[in-house]
Curated annotation (Swiss-Prot):
Biological process annotations from GO: thiazole biosynthetic process
UniProt GO molecular function: iron ion binding
Organism: Mycobacterium tuberculosis (strain ATCC 25618 / H37Rv)
PANTHER family: THIAMINE THIAZOLE SYNTHASE
Taxonomic classification: Bacteria, Bacillati, Actinomycetota, Actinomycetes, Mycobacteriales
One GO cellular component term: plasma membrane
Record-annotated disulphide pairs: none
Propeptide: 1-4
The protein, known as: Protein Rv3254
Source organism, top-level taxon: Bacteria
InterPro entries cross-referenced by the UniProt entry: FAD/NAD-bd_sf (IPR036188)
Cited Gene3D superfamilies: FAD/NAD(P)-binding domain
């Protein structure tokens, strides 16, 4: 291998220029003299789809909590996105149509509390973040493939990364070594860190999984302005309907229609068939608008077999000099739209862990980050898993016995939220991770849901007891 580059005590390396990698680089820039992000893909200078990010062709939005966290990390981001035409969802009743688990929530009113979310396309959001990172004087993004981190057995730490030299193939002697004080693995779901750990003499992390079997099919389209007032339209899959869809309006006036199937159900592959599914799942005003839609380009397809949480927080030993980040730790059911928000929360954990280490001049950075990440991952993972098991025919490992009964109770809550705007707003805020990461209603909220469902039940009983009058024939 070729010689060392850089001072290992003042250099951080990030593997991958995904949204997670860009967030990590932004945090690291405040603690290291030099930050290098290595990305195998050629990065576009303007918003554009990337071959190594197949999910960027499908429905994306920035939840309210995620918007707050991203704007804190990248000041001015939200202002610039709106200036570029990114739709902003506010407290108005005409912004969102939300169908969840077979229930259409009563969101057709002005929300009592502030709620602001944004609808950038994934390529636009990545471009906004990337250009901000590139403006940092101590950060560079380099197009190179990291073959693996370099582990020093005597020190029991990662001391840098090995880069694949063009045309080197399997020639390890031609790999280039880049020294680093810290390596952040933001390589996404395809991370090889569990394999590297076993090669270095450490245990592989246990994995919690939810086998959901999601398949996507998406198509962009245009419609005349004003046909649809809402900027977000969602009809989620349910226990009795394994197909769902979402429609979003993006920054350039283009819409995307994403259809998906759970439990290995296949979504419709053509735009006409997607519209036919919309006819089945959405009110007539949406399908009338789709009848005037002009499709753009070709459909895009993607698969997401399982949600996965690598439990680095449970490892007793972990090498120094490397930390996992983003989807390399936990990847969530993308139909819930919470993955980017969870990454932004982890960026905050990374910042606090680095501050704590600098203040104490010691400490285990990886252990602190892994513990903090687990604390915020657990409630969202649990909420996702209960929903998938209860409504999407998923299987999970491990599977606590109380998850299915909890899902049944929450189904009743969603039923009440169809016509109770207070319950609908509570769900929308918790689902957006605003007020709490835990989807656990307070006693007053539970009482409101019970009272609401009881009134509906009593009304049904009265209607059943009413005598049916029939007219006698002359």
């Amino acid at each position: 291998m070729t010689g060392r580059v850089g001072n290992p005590k003042d250099h951080a390396v990030v593997i991958g220029a995904s949204i997670a990698g860009l967030c990590a680089a932004r945090v690291l820039s405040d603690f290291y003299s030099t930050v290098t992000v290595f990305e195998r893909d050629e990065l576009p200078e303007a918003p554009a789809n990337r071959a190594t990010v197949p999910q960027d062709r499908h429905l994306h939005m920035l939840m309210a909590r995620g918007a707050q966290e991203f704007d804190s990390l990248f000041p001015g981001l939200l202002h610039d996105m709106v200036a570029a035409g990114v739709p902003m969802l506010e407290n108005r009743p005409d912004c969102i149509y939300l169908g969840a688990a077979g229930h259409v929530l009563g969101t057709g009113h002005t929300l009592r509390k502030e709620f602001t979310a944004y609808v950038p396309s994934r390529p636009h959001l990545e471009w906004q973040l990337r250009r901000r990172v590139l403006q940092l004087s101590n950060v560079q993004i380099v197009r190179r493939l990291v073959t693996e981190p370099q582990f020093e057995r005597r020190q029991q730490r990662v001391v840098g990364v090995l880069l694949d030299s063009p045309g080197s193939g399997q020639d390890r002697e031609r790999e280039e070594f880049i020294a680093a004080d810290l390596v952040v693995d933001a390589a996404g779901r395809g991370t090889r860190l569990p394999v590297w750990l076993t090669q270095w003499g450490y245990r592989r992390p246990a994995e919690d999984t939810v086998d959901i079997g999601i398949s996507y099919a998406s198509h962009q389209f245009r419609i005349p302005d004003g046909l649809i007032a809402e900027k977000v339209v969602v009809a989620g899959a349910s226990h009795d309907q394994s197909l769902g869809l979402g429609m979003l309006c993006y920054e350039d006036g283009t819409w995307v229609l994403t259809t998906f199937g759970v439990a290995d159900a296949k979504p419709p592959p053509t735009f006409d068939e997607m519209r036919a599914l919309a006819d089945k799942l959405l009110p007539a005003r949406f399908t009338a608008a789709l009848a005037q839609a002009q499709p753009i380009g070709c459909p895009a397809f993607h698969a997401f077999p399982a949600s996965r949480w690598r439990r680095y927080d449970k490892l007793e030993r972990f090498p120094r000099g490397i930390v996992p980040f983003g989807d390399a730790v936990a990847s969530f059911n993308p139909t819930f739209g919470q993955g980017m928000t969870m990454t932004s929360l982890q960026a905050g954990h990374l910042r606090r862990a680095l501050k704590a280490r600098n203040s104490a001049m010691k400490g285990d950075l990886a252990a602190e980050l892994n513990r903090a990440t687990a604390k915020t991952t657990y409630p969202v993972w649990m909420m996702n898993a209960i929903g998938d098991i209860s409504f999407h025919h998923a299987t999970a490992e491990p599977l606590p016995r109380w998850w299915r009964p909890a899902g049944s109770l929450f189904d009743q809550f969603l039923g009440a939220a169809e016509t109770d705007p207070v319950l609908a707003e509570w769900f929308l805020r918790r689902f957006s991770l605003l007020d709490s990461l835990y989807m656990v209603p307070s006693v007053p909220i539970i009482g409101r849901a019970i009272a609401h469902n009881l009134r509906l039940w009593l009304k049904e009983q009265r209607e059943r007891r009413q005598p049916v009058t029939t007219r006698r024939s002359p």
